[in-house]
A protein has these predicted regions:
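Outer membrane beta-barrel transmembrane domains
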Residues: 167-203, 219-234
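Short glycine/proline- and aromatic-enriched beta-strand/turn motifs that initiate or cap beta-hairpins
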Residues: 20-68, 231
Length: 234
């Protein structure tokens, strides 16, 4: 029992020593990855020839990338500042206003997505728990570069025999930046693991701001990135 206790104590000591980094070191880390984003209360209302289609939003995938600087102010704590691009927004399932079993003229919408393009400035404190393993939290202001809605609309006619004749799909892409807030503030929390200067990280952003000017809607976003740490000051 005593031997097990000392082995556990030794393991704890080794983990804590190996987790320590040199105080005063400065690094930069280019990184790229994937964002999975949605908008809370982000339902889209399609008005088609007097018919309203209320469609809930779903998560969409996007690109994120940039660089972060980190200064080691304590042996187990670092402060980082970054500049990242992130594609956020949401995706919508395909819908139409067709009444099944009833002849008439209808419209269908497909490949509908909302894209919000942000520059993010994350400021985080990282706590190194063990060799290569860290947890992070901080604050992140973001600035909206642009917002676009894209979808394909197809008009079609259903005959009395149930057969349908479709017009060619029309692609629509329009800027809707004026509908959205110019900035966003979020609390990022994450966990990372580093091996041989390669850093894999997952974060979630708790948005504090309304993303849309008139609705109580907020960004929801996960990010998964891979970066490479370069030493500037040792």
């Amino acid at each position: 029992m005593k031997r097990l206790f000392f082995l556990s104590l030794l393991a704890f000591f080794v983990l804590n020593v190996s987790a320590q980094k040199k105080v005063g070191s400065l690094t930069v880390m280019p990184k790229v990855g994937l964002s999975l984003a949605n908008i809370s209360h982000g339902n889209m209302l399609f008005n088609v020839t007097g018919t309203s289609l209320d469609v809930p939003s779903n998560y969409r995938a996007g690109f994120t990338g940039g660089a972060e600087f980190e200064y080691q102010f304590l042996s187990q704590c670092g402060l980082s500042l970054g500049a990242l691009y992130s594609l956020q927004g949401c995706h919508y399932k395909d819908v139409s206003n067709e009444v099944h079993g009833q002849a008439g003229s209808y419209s269908g919408f497909s490949n509908t997505a909302l894209g919000l393009h942000y520059i993010q400035i994350p400021v985080l404190v990282g706590i190194y728990l063990a060799d290569g393993l860290a947890v992070k939290a901080g604050v992140q202001p973001s600035f909206l570069l642009g917002a676009r809605a894209k979808y394909d609309v197809t008009n079609f006619v259903v005959g009395t025999d149930g057969g349908a004749v479709y017009d060619p799909a029309k692609h629509v892409s329009k800027s809707i930046k004026g509908l959205f807030a110019s900035s966003d503030v979020a609390i990022p929390v994450g966990i990372s693991y580093e091996y041989a200067n390669v850093v894999m990280e997952a974060r979630y952003l708790f948005s504090l701001s309304k993303v849309e000017k008139t609705l109580d809607a907020k960004n929801r976003c996960f990010t998964f990135t891979v970066g490479y740490r370069l030493n500037l000051l040792k």
